Amino acid sequence: HPDVWGGIACHSGDMYFPYACLPDFPMAIDTLRRFEGNPAAFLKKMRTKIKLRGSDIMTLMILALAAFYDPDLENPDRIQLPFDARTGELIDERWQQWLRWDPIQMAEDHVDNLKKLKCLFFDCGSRDQYRLHHGARILAQRFEDLGVPHRYEEFDDDHSSIQYRYDVSLPLLADTLS
C-alpha cells in the first residue's frame, strides 16, 4: 500500500524461505517428537520451563511462523505444521502456503505498487546465521530484473544486535515522509 506507507525499510528480513526456514525444520521436528509431535503439548511445557534450550527457541520460532504463514482460520488454536511431525516429510500443501508469503515469491505480483514507493530499503549482515543474506541478495537481483527502484546494503555482521543499522534506515524513511 504505497498510498499509506510510502516507504519501507527492512533489516535482515525473512526471505527465500527454502534457505531461511527449511533448514531449521529438522531441529523443530526432533524437538516436537519429544511431545509426540503435538505443538500444544510443547507450548504448554515451554510456559513452565525456567531456561529454554536453543532448540526450544528455534521450535517456538517455527511454530510462530506456521501460525502466521498458514493459520487454521476455523481453529485458530491449532498450528498447521508444514511437515509431518512424526516422519519429518514436508507437506507440500502446507509448505506452499508458507511460500506464498515469501518476499521472493511475492515480488513479481506487486511490481506496480513496489515501483510507487518513495523508499524501498533493505539490508542484511553478510554473516547472517539464519542465512537471510542469501535471500536478500536474491531479492535485490529480482528487483533489478523487475525494474523496481530499491537500495540494498550488505554489511559485515550477523543477525544479532544490529540496531545500529537504524542510523541508516531511519534518515531514509524520514526523508520519504518530508
Named regions from a protein language model:
Residues H1-S178:
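Non-catalytic cap/lid and distal C-terminal segments of serine-dependent acyl enzymes
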